[in-house]
Amino acid sequence: MSIGVLEFHGAAGEVTGSCTLLRTDRARILVDFGMFQGTPADEARNAVAPQVDFALLDAIVITHAHIDHCGRLAMATELGFRGRIYCTTATHELLGRVLRSSARLQRARFYERANGSAPWARALMPGEAPGGAPEFPTAHRLFDTPEVRDTMERIEGVPLDREVKIAPHVALTFRNAGHIPGAASAEFSIGVGAARKTVLFSGDLGPDRSALLATPHRPAGADVVIVESTNGERRRDASDPEETLAGIVARAAEKKEKVIVPCFALGRAQLLVHRFARLRTRELMRGLNVYVDSPMAVHGIEALYKHPEYLADEPREIVRAGGAPLWFPELHYVLSKRESMAIDRMVHGGIILAGSGFMDAGPVMRHLEESINREDCTVVLSGYQPEGGFAWKLQRGADRAQFNGKTVPVRARTVRVEGLSGHADQDDLMKWFAGFVQKPARVLINHGVDSARAALAGRLKTELGIECTLPARDVPIEI
């Protein structure tokens, strides 16, 4: 018996722009409405509405507050959407801040590109000639503050593991995905009585074991599974990231180095703060100050204190006992641009955590412009980096960098720390599927480049006998 149809309008063969339409004979539900990220050309795709009739949607479901899953949400009402939006309670609390921040950034980019003042940066490999400013596509204001306000009025926050009816013959239950504060898998129960079927969207899954976040929920089964594959061809390095960070801290303390750590505000920033807090407990921080240069990262920390169900056992028990596993005396929150600029002048032998994690925008680029030509600076990289981008080149030996046309030598040391990814690796994904009591009738792999999707599909077939589909963008698939 057919359950319905799936249409993937983003994150099919790529890792951004998540947007999937689930159609049944009685309902239409959009799962995620995220932004495309990467090159300026990728970002320009955000202005093109997906092939979805928003006026006919019963509901929109958001799996978590990362911009590639929720970034276009405030466009929905302008496109005709009049239904309800569902996410976890913790995600609800973060979404308003994420969308308002996005609206401010869009306004800034619109005016900067209109008057030719858009900031830019480029890392240069040995022998690579400096170039002029990149040709930015016309900036589009996808939405502004009024649209964010309208959107927030439509959102219903739902606690984990509580079933809620969201459309005719469709019920939704969120399961902890272990990825970032508030992140969830979306489990849909479709139909009535004995004919009910389960369609499970994994969302972005976290690693099987994390010192900070809870292990992702292990589903007993589902009829149809849509699974992410960001790290579908990767297997986690066995090295302990905490010991690598301890070495970086020891050197910084000895040599009075500035350490710059590009990181995502939700997920990576909290993981790093927790690691530094553990080093402080072990008396290994050596008095170094740590600056969190991201108000959004601070909100992510607060979300974990308010919703300890997203924490791993040890930090959860600390919070419930009244403790603070993401705090230590040398931790400082940087909440304004003035404070951010000040730490460039005052940090000697300190650590700065700043966005963006891809090193394509945000305060981290200003910190790099100030310090990348200094030998007493270390840049710490972790996680996935887009090919050809600033961080990708820096990791591979870039010897110069351009900031708004000015070329400076790269004298800073670059260190990579493995084991901090907020995504499940291939082994973690296999464990997730191995817990199914009965094999799903259909598995569709999205949210990954094609090589990652193919690698995961091959291993699922070989080891678990699960046949997989790799959906193409905008092509309906009957389930």
Predicted regions and their residues:
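Divalent metal-coordination and catalytic microenvironments
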Residues: L6, L22, D32, H64-A65, ...
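Pre-active-site segment of Zn-dependent metallo-hydrolases
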Residues: A12-G17, T24-I155, L205-A214, R396-N404, ...
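Cap/insert and terminal regions of metallo-dependent hydrolase folds
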Residues: R84, P181, S185, G206-D293, ...
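Short secondary-structure boundary/capping segments
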Residues: R100-L105, Y111-E112, P241-E243, F276-L279, ...
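Acidic/glycine-enriched edge-of-secondary-structure segments
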Residues: F33-Q37, D58, R196-S202, D208, ...
